[in-house]
C-alpha cells in the first residue's frame, strides 16, 4: 500500500476510528484537498522560501501568496467547524496538521489566524501528536504559534 491518504483511509477503516461513515464525503473532500492542494503548495513554499531562499523571487512570492491563501481558507473553514471535516477529529486533520506544524517555515504568522490557531493548539495537545513529534528526537514538540 502506498500514498498517505490511501494509507490513512485503510487504517481508519480497519480501526473504525477518525472516519465516521456519515461524514465520509466531507472527510474525503478535506483529505483530498490536503493531498492535492495544501500539501503540494506548502511543500513548494518550503522549497523556495525555507530551503532555497533568494534563488527564485517568482517562486518565493508565488508560493508565499498561495500559502497565505491556504491559511485564510483553513481559518474560514474552522470558523464554523471545530475540525476540518466534522465535529470530531478525523483523518483529514491528521493529514493536514503536519503541514501547519511547520508554520515557522511559512513566515505567515499562525497567530494571525484565530480559528486555525485554535485548531492547531488543540491538536498539538493530543498525546499521539506529542508522541509522534518525540519519535526521532525526544526534545521535539509541536512549535507554538507565533
Question: Where are these predicted regions, by residue range?
Answer:
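Hydrophobic alpha-helical bundle segments that form small-molecule/ligand-binding pockets
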Residues: 74-85
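GST-like domain detector, emphasizing the conserved glutathione-binding G-site
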Residues: 1-69, 75
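Residue-level signal for nonpolar/aromatic packing positions in well-ordered secondary structure
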Residues: 7, 27, 74, 93, ...
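GST superfamily/GST-like fold recognition
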Residues: 41-46, 84-112, 117-123, 130, ...
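Terminal-tail/helix-coil boundary detector
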Residues: 134-146
